[in-house]
Amino acid sequence: MSHRIKVDIEVAAFISRAAESLGLEVHLDPHTTSIPSDEHLAIVAINSASTQLATYPVMSVAKFRNRIVVKPTQANQELLKKLQIVVNERVKSSNQSGVATYRFTLNGEFIEVSEVISIDSVWSMEYAHTSVFENAVRSAYQLPLGKTELLTQEFLVMNFDVPRNLGMTEPFLHLFAHEPGYRVVKATSHTGYVALQGDRDLFEKVSHAVDYLEGVINE
């Protein structure tokens, strides 16, 4: 049986790993996606053929030096409830199956919907009960979807893309020596993401780590 999942080539490895962890196989439908440059809000919705719908908490998505920065939004509850209703209605009216990311302005105006899993979903690998990637595989096989609730309310995730001429071992050792809480996960030999949870200086710490990995700074 063939199960094709639309995914950005940058994070395709994470789908393959999720499938392997479940003992399943999937066929990838690779794409190259573009995420809006301005800071915005994003909700991932996953709908299985068995009519089960799961949505993830609203994330704030921004860019820093063309890198994607994701963290829990601080938007008010009234707006969050409104966005949830909009997403639920759009999913039902579109007969969507699989994964879709709904993007809105900070004021709640609809921007777009993408059916391709992209880099702005990697946060879920660290801070959701079940990642977007695992639930995408579950949806493809019409299996019950996993829980989407957050494991923590304070975290920040940023992707990296290191020049191929730079080594990775020494930077990894340096970062872990200075901040044991870093999660540095590779998608390929020189791409991946840095994640950190905590209650202070998250952007400064994570952006420092990404700059160090990419050779922008050397200390």
Language-model segments: which ranges?
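Electropositive phosphate-/nucleotide-binding environments in soluble metabolic enzymes
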Residues: 9, 77-84, 126-130, 134, ...
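Peripheral (often C-terminal) accessory segments that flank ATP-dependent C-N-forming ligase machineries
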Residues: 138-219
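A short beta-strand motif that forms the metal-chelation/ATP-contact edge
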Residues: 108-118
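Short, charged N-terminal beta->alpha structural module
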Residues: 2-26
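Internal nucleotide-binding/catalytic subdomain
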Residues: 22-24, 28-99, 104-108
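Short, hydrophobic beta-strand segments that form beta-sheet elements in well-ordered domains
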Residues: 5-7, 24-34, 158-160, 196
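Active-site "cap" helix and flanking loop/linker of ATP-utilizing ligase/carboxylase catalytic domains
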Residues: 84-101, 116-162
